[in-house]
Amino acid sequence: MSKQRIYEYAKELNLKSKEIIDELKSMNIEVSNHMQALEDDQIKALDKKFKKEQKNDNKQSTQNNHQKSNNQNQNKGQQKDNKKNQQQNNKGNKGNKKNNRNNKKNNKNNKPQNQPAAPKEIPSKVTYQEGITVGEFADKLNVESSEIIKKLFLLGIVANINQSLNQETIELIADDYGVEVEEEVVINEEDLSIYFEDEKDDPEAIERPAVVTIMGHVDHGKTTLLDSIRHTKVTAGEAGGITQHIGAYQIENDGKKITFLDTPGHAAFTTMRARGAQVTDITILVVAADDGVMPQTIEAINHAKEAEVPIIVAVNKIDKPTSNPDRVMQELTEYGLIPEDWGGETIFVPLSALSGDGIDDLLEMIGLVAEVQELKANPKNRAVGTVIEAELDKSRGPSASLLVQNGTLNVGDAIVVGNTYGRIRAMVNDLGQRIKTAGPSTPVEITGINDVPQAGDRFVVFSDEKQARRIGESRHEASIIQQRQESKNVSLDNLFEQMKQGEMKDLNVIIKGDVQGSVEALAASLMKIDVEGVNVRIIHTAVGAINESDVTLANASNGIIIGFNVRPDSGAKRAAEAENVDMRLHRVIYNVIEEIESAMKGLLDPEFEEQVIGQAEVRQTFKVSKVGTIAGCYVTEGKITRNAGVRIIRDGIVQYEGELDTLKRFKDDAKEVAKGYECGITIENYNDLKEGDVIEAFEMVEIKR
């Protein structure tokens, strides 16, 4: 049964919510607003006060009604007798009419004058809200507004009745009247941070799994370490063997669960790593024993220290002949990470992620550190947490990977996620299994929200869908206003900078990516490129395939488009060719940064250029033993040649890039198949072809220097 709120209780007793709030405050009960739920003991106390008063009022009104009815009965009897007397007196009254008229004139002059109302007493204490006006403050003090205006004038402040007062002025005026003032703290329900509370003091809080972030320099073995822990292989599926997105996984060790956030290690993902440190309880710093401390290692240390998160150092690759764990320990002491063996407090675990040696020791250390931290959460509370990743899926719509930090998340919950909202339609765990509930420290992917949130946004569950909609829409509108204000400010700032620097050149960039985290990280990396005389200006970022709107914007702003793991649709391709807009498509983030930086320095001297020669649509698939998947295709653009490179595109996102294995027309091998013809295609080392996929053929053409 849901608890009764203050306004509902007031409505039941036909009272104002303010009366109930005032009474609760007199009982020393903290009240935020009329939406606050009442406990059973609070309702009983209020019943004693207000229902007793109402009984007395009802009793008094009943007595008055009895008295009134008795008086009416007596009056009826008296009226009969008075009729006779009136008839007799009428004759005498006619003679007195003149005298009465004269008396009325005299009485008008002799009427007692209305006495002025007694002045209201000035209260000893008043409360006020930020932005209170002169008129409102005068009403609280029970004085005329003109009095306040005079006092302000004497203080050298010219104000009118609608002028807002600051804290200092309010205190000066109140002091003049001998009144104590206190500012009311107004709780803004749109601020999601107010729903995040420390659960250590909650008597109902129970132990929760630790959230662990793996950090370190690129290629030091972070993903391999996580794979070794989960007994899975993720690295092989990543472009260039490097983790591109934050993944959240949960494992069980000695009966206790541990949640891992796999944060990419390259400097380009600084923003993602910083976000990981904000939600984590323990940081695993992976350092290769044969490589030592590198720039991203230092960056990871700084992020963990800033978030005040305990660090466990995993010295990886100890099985290599060139490994030197002692050198790693020595180098890390310069950054305040002193091993326990050397009298410090930092735990060092030597291990090999590839062979699995030392993994059990690492998990044991994580358990010990988590035990000392006393990590707790209350699964009975409303669910709150953070967005790990978000993307737009063509079939499922907007989806978000969430980490539940407190409470329990359920399918069907009304939820506000950042500046968007919705009702959870489906929930999937890290193993891809559909689940109905998710407790604290559990990573899940949800669908049912109406827009793609930002990675790192907070989410809060509300019991009322209307409230969630109202808060979500309000936050969305506020974010639009803020973006407009920021864009105006940035424009003015840029104009001033241009005036100072003279002929300043801007490189306008539009970034489109497959997931929000990659887009954010790429934008942050490009903004850090420091080339004298040229500034990178990110004019638009979004998730999804490159479309005609992006090309139009790039053309209007004289900018370039960077596609990260996405492809342009056919309309965007035609528009880019017609408008001569430069589109750069990449799958590995290093190449983007290197290419842009080289171009800005004037050092870019490409030897080869990719040229798309055709596209074919997969109409039907056939699985043949010892051959694999054969795709029955229809060439929609250009031509498909046997020696061309190919990439598989699904919903605008690149799924695979490789080589053609076979190209056939009916049962015969073909060197090329032109537009408008059907063909059979098999892809080398790839069988996950589906109907509707687009096979794009390309060639590398040498560019003359």
Swiss-Prot record:
Kinase is among the record's keywords: no
Biased composition (Basic and acidic residues): 41-58
Chief place where the protein resides: cytoplasm
Feature: compositional bias, Low complexity: 59-77
Region annotated G3, chain positions: 262-265
Region (G2): 241-245
Annotated stretches, region: G5: 352-354
Annotated localization: Cytoplasm
Intrachain disulfide bonds: none
Biological process (GO), any one: translational initiation
Region (G4): 316-319
PROSITE patterns: G_TR_2, IF2
SUPFAM superfamilies the UniProt entry points to: Initiation factor IF2/eIF5b, domain 3 (SSF52156), P-loop containing nucleoside triphosphate hydrolases (SSF52540), Translation proteins (SSF50447)
Region described as G1: spans on this chain: 216-223
Superkingdom as given in the UniProt entry: Bacteria
Function field: One of the essential components for the initiation of protein synthesis. Protects formylmethionyl-tRNA from spontaneous hydrolysis and promotes its binding to the 30S ribosomal subunits. Also involved in the hydrolysis of GTP during the formation of the 70S ribosomal complex.
UniProt-recorded name of the protein: Translation initiation factor IF-2
Species whose genome carries this gene: Staphylococcus aureus (strain NCTC 8325 / PS 47)
